């Protein structure tokens, strides 16, 4: 009886102790659950942000500020938007980015900071749960902590992969806009030198064409402008299909509303249709002409028709490249950031397509640099021939004498033809007209002689003053 009583007491005591442990464990679990809920609701967003597949709003702003900063600093969209005007009327839909988000290295360091913070938190949580698990009724805490760490690691892996593809796309974009900037600068230099050759050709063509031999360097320089013009426009035309291909592949990933606002903001033509296709010439705007390419050497507008057509051909080809490159950048700026899968696809396509376009642009830059070197040599040779040897054959006495002999022969032939025409006396009106024309030629010759007398007197005066100074 005593033995049975002792056994029943031990069983009851063991049962009560087990129930007490269960109660304590449930109470501890409730307290721990409240602590985790408080941490997730109030403290966790302040430390790491919301735990989901989407990135934090600050990270999204950080990334797009980096893109905008790259584009703005490359001067590809500066001056072609309506931010200044809309600032006084209403809040603009796009603001200037901050220079603190100016490089992919800062963006990567920011992510490394978040990743390090996550590792430290996971380590502290693991150590704390291991210490609490030493108590028999808190062993489940370690299981909860390990489950949370695994889930957090999975989220961080997705986060890391998103950062990685974003940084790849950002690096490709950075390389692309830098190449665009170099391409534009080199193109403007070539264009300015072509205009300089054109100006020299227009000034010298009428005076040189009749008196210089065919193998003279000055006459040879007159044809170099045409060669450079066709080389440059041909280079632009080869790049245009590659730009169009990249634009057609990037456009489906852009948010329609964001893209529409950006095209309106930068006054770009909305060439995109419902079938993910576009027409470059639809709604083209003349307000997007680059000042350096379209207003360079504005004073030289008196070219002949052939040269003007060549220069206009260059400007048209470059204008199309400028429009479509801005549309590519606007498509990238309008990418939505709403899911991991969408971002993975969009930024991978940016990394691949924009990277390929950058490679094609690099190859074109090599050819453009060759054209630039040739244009520099042409301009230097033209300047050397026109300054160091200013019209050597025209200014010599023999050439001047032959020129006046030809002029004298023409005047004598005209005099004889008019005198014979007057002697016939068939048409009085035609005789009067012929005499008027003859008188006008004489007046021009008198003006030329008067100008020669004036210039000769001026030269004599300068010579006299120079002798006095000595």
Swiss-Prot record:
Residues carrying a glycan: 204, 221, 385
Molecular-function GO term, any one: protein-membrane adaptor activity
Topology term for the membrane: Multi-pass membrane protein
Subcellular location: Peroxisome membrane
Keyword terms of this UniProt record: Glycoprotein, Membrane, Peroxisome, Receptor, Transmembrane, Transmembrane helix
Chain segments annotated as transmembrane: 22-44, 111-131, 135-155
Paired cysteines (S-S): none
Stretches assigned to coiled coil: none
Any one cellular-component term (Gene Ontology): cell division site
GO biological process: peroxisome inheritance
Principal location: membrane
Family of the protein in this entry: Belongs to the INP2 family.
Protein known as: Inheritance of peroxisomes protein 2
């Amino acid at each position: 009886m005593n033995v049975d009583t002792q056994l029943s007491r031990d069983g009851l005591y063991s049962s009560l102790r087990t129930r007490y442990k269960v109660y304590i464990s449930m109470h501890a679990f409730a307290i721990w659950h409240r602590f985790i809920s408080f941490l997730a609701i109030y403290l966790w967003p302040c430390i790491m942000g919301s735990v989901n597949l989407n990135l934090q709003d600050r990270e999204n702003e950080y990334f797009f500020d980096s893109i905008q900063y790259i584009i703005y600093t490359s001067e590809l969209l500066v001056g072609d938007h309506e931010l200044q005007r809309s600032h006084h009327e209403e809040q603009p839909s796009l603001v200037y980015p901050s220079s603190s988000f100016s490089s992919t290295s800062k963006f990567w360091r920011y992510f490394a900071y978040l990743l390090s913070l996550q590792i430290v938190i996971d380590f502290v949580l693991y150590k704390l749960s291991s210490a609490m698990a030493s108590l028999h009724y808190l062993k489940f805490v370690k299981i909860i902590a390990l489950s949370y760490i695994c889930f957090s690691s999975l989220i961080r892996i997705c986060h890391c992969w998103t950062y990685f593809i974003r940084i790849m796309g950002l690096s490709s974009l950075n390389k692309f806009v830098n190449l665009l900037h170099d391409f534009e600068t080199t193109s403007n230099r070539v264009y300015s030198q072509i205009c300089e050759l054109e100006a020299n050709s227009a000034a010298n063509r009428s005076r040189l064409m009749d008196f210089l031999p065919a193998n003279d360097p000055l006459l040879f320089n007159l044809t170099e402008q045409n060669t450079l013009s066709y080389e440059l426009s041909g280079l632009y035309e080869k790049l245009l299909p590659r730009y169009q291909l990249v634009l057609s592949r990037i456009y489906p990933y852009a948010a329609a509303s964001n893209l529409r606002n950006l095209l309106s903001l930068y006054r770009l033509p909305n060439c995109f249709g419902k079938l993910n296709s576009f027409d470059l010439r639809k709604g083209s705007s003349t307000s997007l002409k680059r000042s350096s390419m379209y207003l360079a050497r504005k004073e030289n507008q008196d070219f002949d028709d052939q040269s003007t057509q060549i220069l206009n051909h260059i400007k048209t080809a470059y204008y199309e490249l400028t429009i479509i490159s801005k549309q590519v950048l606007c498509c990238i700026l309008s990418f939505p950031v709403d899911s991991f899968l969408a971002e993975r696809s969009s930024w991978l396509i940016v990394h691949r397509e924009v990277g390929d376009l950058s490679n094609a642009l690099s190859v074109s830059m090599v050819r453009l640099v060759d054209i630039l070197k040739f244009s520099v040599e042409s301009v230097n040779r033209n300047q050397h021939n026109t300054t160091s040897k200013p019209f050597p054959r025209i200014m010599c006495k023999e050439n001047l004498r032959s020129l006046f002999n030809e002029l004298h022969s023409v005047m004598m032939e005209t005099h004889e033809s008019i005198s014979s025409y007057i002697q016939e006396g068939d048409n009085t009106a035609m005789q009067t007209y012929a005499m008027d024309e003859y008188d006008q030629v004489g007046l021009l010759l008198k003006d030329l002689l008067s100008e020669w007398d004036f210039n000769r007197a001026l030269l004599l005066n300068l010579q006299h003053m120079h002798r006095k100074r000595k």
